[in-house]
Amino acid sequence: MNPYEYAATHGPRAGDRVRLGDSGLTIRVESDAQRYGDEFLAGFGKTARDGLHLKAAAVRETCDVVISNVVVIDAAQGIRKVSIGIREGRICSIGRAGNPDTLDGVDVVVGTGTSIVSGEGLIATAGAVDTHVHLLSPRIMEASLASGVTTIIGQEFGPVWGVGVNSPWALRHAFNAFDAWPVNIGFLGRGSSSDAAPLVEALAEGGASGFKVHEDMGAHTRALDTALRVAEEHDVQVALHSDGLNECLSVEDTLRVLEGRTIHAFHIEGCGGGHVPNVLKMAGVPNVIGSSTNPTLPFGRDAVAEHYGMIVSVHDLKTDLPGDAAMARDRIRAGTMGAEDVLHDLGAIGITSSDAQGMGRAGETVRRTFAMAGKMKAERGAPADVDHDNERVLRYMAKLTINPAIAHGLAHEVGSIEVGKLADIVLWRPEFFGAKPQLVLKSGFPAYGVVGDPNAATDTCEPLVLGPQFGAHGATPAEISVAFVAQAALDQGNDLMPTRRRRVAVRGTRGIGPADLRLNSRTGSVDVDQRTGLVTLDGDPLRSEPADSASLNRLYFL
């Protein structure tokens, strides 16, 4: 069997290279858990049969579900072809699939009662974690799931001015509403308060999992310090949208207020909000975890023009007021937008997110992240001594998965494909990688993916569309998803949250920084020239030209 026929049947072998959509990125498979000539394969006349590669045993002794022979791209696993065993919603084993009674070296025991997801020729990633979502519409869930996002840290509960939710009454209804979608959910409480009472109330009584300090509601010294003090006491994260007008604090002042305490700096480039013109200075600071939102990724020719209208709309500005118009324009800087891409490529910004409906697009974070990776490869080049982009691909994958999970205390449950974690796994056809997933498994159960004509003879008959699977119907979404809350909510003991989801306490959010992120731990001195807009890192200038076009875009979407 020649290599192309083998790959078409069993998936690529170790050493084979795979193109990722039209991104310009290529991965090389580092290892293959299969053994040549004795492969596990389901189908008519294949080896996944009783007495061959299926063990005759109770399901509890094997797996509920197995994903066979899939290429994993994961910051923890690397890029490997393996099978993934799932039991009771969690990853229970990774490696070679089969029957240990007939095969040697079996890691994933597949039984006669195991359901099989054929992963040959597909790519598996951990479900993306979006930590910056303004939940102004319930339809955001559809866009997120259809892009491979399985965990959301949100603010608001509809078209209300919130920037964080503190009311236990509102959080109770919000958690209840989310039981309709197969997505893990956590809420940020509003941290812009000089008094700690509403913050503690949000955590202990409402079930919030962190705070959002936002300039529109107050990002001054007292509010920021109060949020950080409560966060330190309760082990939750503080997300910061800093003082763009520099009314109370400059970027240097904000860093002093932190006093070395951990913070997650949202849209650290600044167009989405933050100290004008040099909030990007916070990137590379050891206690600041920086993230980007997707409208500026990758930096393109229309980015400057596009953002004026978005800023005006989201922040309720009046364009006929000269002061409002000037405030909007001051936030838009081509120099920092271009430098943002380079800082990502260097690993100095470790997270990407959407800022959905708060100047971002819920369904575009994954594809814009890899479009940025492709742009950086084209602009900055690939390593001369290798014929693949594994290092770059894994760095950008970490920005979507494990790093946001680490920042918000979720990494013990989600963010990577590791034994013991929830089986939130996204399967992609290589030609659609980053743009449109083939299947989204939530706790190992089909939740969203490609569906065909329901009246057709087979499930692959056109038209093929992305839509809900059985995991998105009935009571199942709540059963296969979790609610991330503060430990204080679990300790409270009084059940004010009607959600049917399992509640999981966030942890490990304090005393961390870029050094704790995967593959994105670069620190250094970032400066922005206030006259020219030139950005430097440790004195070296950072420039990136606006792209005329972006990958993973028009080829896949009308």
Show which residues each predicted segment covers.
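Flexible inter-domain linker/hinge segments
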Residues: 1-62, 466, 474-512
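Short, surface-exposed, low-complexity cationic segments
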Residues: 461, 540-558
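Hydrophobic, small-residue-rich alpha-helical packing segments that form membrane-like cores
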Residues: 113-122, 140-278
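Acidic, glycine-enriched loop/beta-strand segments at the rims
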Residues: 73-83, 397, 405-439
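Active-site neighborhoods of metal-dependent hydrolases
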Residues: 1-50, 196-203, 207-222, 244-248, ...
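C-terminal, active-site-flanking charged/polar segments
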Residues: 425-465
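Histidine-rich, glycine-flanked metal-binding segment
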Residues: 35-65, 72-125, 453
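Metallo-beta-lactamase
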Residues: 129-133
